[in-house]
C-alpha cells in the first residue's frame, strides 16, 4: 500500500478495511470499517478531507480530491464504480456512482440514489433520496425502483465480501507458463448478475 503523510496528516485506515497495494492514500484520508479500496485508486487528501464510511467501496482507478475546508464523503455502503471521479462532493448512504462518472464540487447525491455510468453531475447539484440520475449534465429521470436498489445492494455486498476474500488470499505472485487443467471459475457470494 502507498500511504503518504502530508503536512503531518497521516491517512487513517480501519483494520477491517482492504486497500489494494497499488492504491495511493495521501494526507487527510479516513477509511472506515469493511471498506474496499481497489487497484490504482487515488485518494488525495492534500487539500480537503476525504472520508469513506463503513461498508463502502472505491473501485479501480477512482479519484477522490477536494478543495481546502471541504469534505469529500462517500456515505455508508456507498458504491463507487471503476474510474469515477469525486471532487468535493457528498455521496449519500447506500448510493451508487456508475463507472467513469464525474461528481463535481458541492454536489450532493441523495441516499439510495444511482448515478448512471459516464454521467457528469454539475457543481452545486443537490439531489434527493432515491433518484436515478443520468446524462451530461446529469438530471433526475425517475425514482430508483425496489428491484434496482436490491440489485445495487447485492453488488455492494459482493464488494463487502471481497474485503475478507482479499485479506485471506490476495498476494503477489509470478504468472504460470500455461493454464492448469480443470481450472475452476471464481464464484461470487450473491446471485447478482449484470443489469441489462
Curated annotation (Swiss-Prot):
Pfam families, A to Z: Hexapep (PF00132)
UniProt record similarity statement: Belongs to the transferase hexapeptide repeat family.
Role this protein plays: Overproduction of CaiE stimulates the activity of CaiB and CaiD.
GO BP terms: carnitine metabolic process
Protein name, as recorded: Carnitine operon protein CaiE
PANTHER family in alphabetical order: DYNACTIN SUBUNIT P25, GAMMA CARBONIC ANHYDRASE-LIKE 1, MITOCHONDRIAL-RELATED
Region (Disordered): 173-196
Family matches, as SUPFAM superfamilies: Trimeric LpxA-like enzymes
Biased composition, class Polar residues, residue ranges: 187-196
Record's keyword terms, sorted: Repeat, Transferase
Biological pathway: Amine and polyamine metabolism; carnitine metabolism
Amino acid at each position: 500500500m502507498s500511504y503518504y503523510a502530508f503536512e503531518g496528516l497521516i491517512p487513517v485506515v480501519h483494520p477491517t478495511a482492504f486497500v489494494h497495494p497499488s492504491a495511493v492514500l495521501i494526507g487527510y484520508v479516513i477509511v472506515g470499517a469493511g471498506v474496499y479500496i481497489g487497484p490504482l485508486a487515488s485518494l488525495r487528501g492534500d487539500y480537503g478531507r476525504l472520508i469513506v464510511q463503513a461498508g463502502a467501496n472505491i473501485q479501480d482507478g477512482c479519484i477522490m480530491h477536494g478543495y481546502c475546508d471541504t469534505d469529500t464523503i462517500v456515505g455508508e455502503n456507498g458504491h463507487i464504480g471503476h474510474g469515477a471521479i469525486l471532487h468535493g462532493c457528498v455521496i449519500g448512504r447506500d448510493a451508487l456512482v456508475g463507472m467513469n462518472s464525474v461528481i463535481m464540487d458541492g454536489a450532493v447525491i441523495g441516499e439510495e440514489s444511482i448515478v448512471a455510468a459516464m454521467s457528469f453531475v454539475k457543481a452545486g447539484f443537490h439531489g434527493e433520496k432515491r433518484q436515478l440520475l443520468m446524462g451530461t449534465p446529469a438530471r433526475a429521470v425517475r425514482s430508483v425502483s425496489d428491484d434496482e436498489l436490491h440489485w445495487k445492494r447485492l453488488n455492494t455486498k459482493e464488494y463487502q465480501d471481497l474485503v475478507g476474500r482479499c485479506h485471506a488470499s490476495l498476494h503477489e505472485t509470478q504468472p504460470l507458463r500455461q493454464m492448469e487443467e480443470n481450472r475452476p471459475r471464481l464464484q461470487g457470494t450473491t446471485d447478482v448478475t449484470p443489469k441489462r
